[in-house]
Amino acid sequence: MEFRVIIPARFDSTRLPGKALVDIAGKPMIQHVYESAIKSGAEEVVIATDDKRIRQVAEDFGAVVCMTSSDHQSGTERIAEAAVALGFEDDEIIVCLQGDEPLIPPDAIRKLAEDLDEHDNVKVASLCTPITEVDELFNPHSTKVVLNRRNYALYFSHAPIPWGRDTFSDKENLQLNGSHYRHVGIYAYRVGFLEEYLSWDACPAEKMEALEQLRILWHGGRIHMVVAKSKCPPGVDTEEDLERVRAYF
């Protein structure tokens, strides 16, 4: 099975400006993400960006870079432009790996591509990991996902879902029962689907939650979720996240 990885990266992050280039253990964050993608066994790894500073740094450490428009609302829109520019075929599998996931395990990247390859009727797959800590469940920077019995996503939110009507009133004594999952910022797409995604308007829930994947559910699409067998550390959204990742390295 062959697959490619595209890493969308922008400089003007709202919560942590310039985070793609912040130093982590002597390397810019985007390089750590790139190296994880290389280790996954991908046929090709490309960084898609609209920023010349990111392009220069990426090319300096040997990455292939595709320059894109600065008008995109999401990473999915950015990689869709890159996939067309690079001439990828409709049936090829592209993994969209966000540029703020420096701790993503390489085997998780490959597993996601394999999951999409094994499900011929699925156009989008993504990754989640069980939530084991109450603080993470109630952290608004952590995206939660609710699954159906076949591991398709029902909804994504920054809110703690599913809501425990009878248990959440006492957070100090709350015991999680394995029914809560954190969404990990990585997707696998069939290239042909990306063109379909671009034809859809952003939906109200997507705008309210600032979660691009809700556009897929709103328009009747399905996202098959792979539940990670090993812990996938959260990405970098805030200064606190950055210090946590630096401590890890």
From Swiss-Prot:
<dbReference type="Pfam" id="PF02348">
    <property type="entry name" value="CTP_transf_3"/>
</dbReference>
<dbReference type="InterPro" id="IPR003329">
    <property type="entry name" value="Cytidylyl_trans"/>
</dbReference>
<keyword id="KW-0963">Cytoplasm</keyword>
<comment type="pathway">
    <text>Nucleotide-sugar biosynthesis; CMP-3-deoxy-D-manno-octulosonate biosynthesis; CMP-3-deoxy-D-manno-octulosonate from 3-deoxy-D-manno-octulosonate and CTP: step 1/1.</text>
</comment>
<keyword id="KW-0448">Lipopolysaccharide biosynthesis</keyword>
<protein>
    <recommendedName>
        <fullName>3-deoxy-manno-octulosonate cytidylyltransferase</fullName>
        <ecNumber>2.7.7.38</ecNumber>
    </recommendedName>
</protein>
<keyword id="KW-0808">Transferase</keyword>
<comment type="pathway">
    <text>Bacterial outer membrane biogenesis; lipopolysaccharide biosynthesis.</text>
</comment>
<dbReference type="InterPro" id="IPR029044">
    <property type="entry name" value="Nucleotide-diphossugar_trans"/>
</dbReference>
<dbReference type="GO" id="GO:0033468">
    <property type="term" value="P:CMP-keto-3-deoxy-D-manno-octulosonic acid biosynthetic process"/>
</dbReference>
<comment type="function">
    <text>Activates KDO (a required 8-carbon sugar) for incorporation into bacterial lipopolysaccharide in Gram-negative bacteria.</text>
</comment>
<comment type="similarity">
    <text>Belongs to the KdsB family.</text>
</comment>
<dbReference type="GO" id="GO:0008690">
    <property type="term" value="F:3-deoxy-manno-octulosonate cytidylyltransferase activity"/>
</dbReference>
<dbReference type="InterPro" id="IPR004528">
    <property type="entry name" value="KdsB"/>
</dbReference>
<keyword id="KW-0548">Nucleotidyltransferase</keyword>
<dbReference type="GO" id="GO:0005829">
    <property type="term" value="C:cytosol"/>
</dbReference>
<dbReference type="GO" id="GO:0009103">
    <property type="term" value="P:lipopolysaccharide biosynthetic process"/>
</dbReference>
